């Protein structure tokens, strides 16, 4: 709920942006496996309204930083090209070390913005440093509202206003939790909640209310 990060989400996806999901990616030395090259997103590749941001983006906060050995690699610009034939790219490169791919290199505490359509993957962590990434993503509301979900991060379902609002309460709770932790900071004003006059307070009841909130992940 960092106000600067949520402001970035609004600048990319509009002030009525919707949450996607949250996850930890842990890649320990020697046992962190490879993740094959892939593009995220399943629902909008053939949409008449397809554009480079239609499947949203992820913030990737690096706890210990990331290196070329333990980090994610990306192929710049591929988020604009639609669904790619990855097998052809591997064949053209002669290996899974794709031509033009670059690693995401970060210091501890750095936050990366990664478009979900960008071709990305990672190699086995053969180094000596762990990578822990706190991943949290956001969508344009128009990308999820009334859309049948992809059924990957949550059960396939149509994301109606009620579902989107229910999933978005996590943002409200997070904003209040941060305000309690940093009382001198100006909290982010999340338009869908403030315009509806809805206020969420972070307390013991909130923990119970958030139980299994991820079952409503807006998976597109």
Regions found by a protein language model. Give the residues of each.
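Non-heme Fe(II) oxygenase catalytic core, chiefly the N-lobe of the double-stranded beta-helix
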Residues: 1-108, 121-130, 136-150, 215-220
């Amino acid at each position: 709920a960092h106000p600067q990060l949520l402001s970035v989400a609004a600048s990319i996806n509009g002030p009525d942006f919707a949450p996607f999901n949250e996850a930890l990616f842990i890649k320990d030395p020697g046992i962190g496996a490879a993740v094959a090259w892939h593009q995220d997103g399943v629902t909008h590749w053939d949409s008449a309204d397809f554009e480079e941001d239609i499947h949203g983006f992820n913030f990737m906060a690096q706890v210990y930083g990331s290196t070329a050995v333990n980090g994610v690699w990306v192929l710049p610009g591929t988020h604009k090209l639609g669904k790619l034939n990855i097998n052809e790219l591997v064949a053209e490169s002669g290996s899974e070390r794709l031509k033009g791919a670059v690693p995401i290199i970060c210091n501890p505490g750095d936050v990366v913005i990664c478009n979900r359509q960008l071709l990305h993957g990672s190699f086995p962590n053969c180094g000596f440093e762990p990578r822990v990434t706190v991943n949290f993503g956001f969508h344009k509301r128009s990308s999820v509202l009334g859309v049948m979900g992809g059924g990957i991060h949550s059960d396939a379902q149509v994301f109606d206003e009620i579902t989107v609002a229910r999933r978005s309460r996590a943002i409200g709770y997070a904003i209040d939790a941060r305000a309690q932790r940093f009382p001198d900071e100006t909290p982010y004003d999340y338009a869908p909640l403030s315009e509806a006059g809805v206020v969420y307070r972070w307390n013991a009841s909130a923990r119970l209310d958030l139980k299994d909130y991820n079952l409503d992940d807006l998976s597109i």
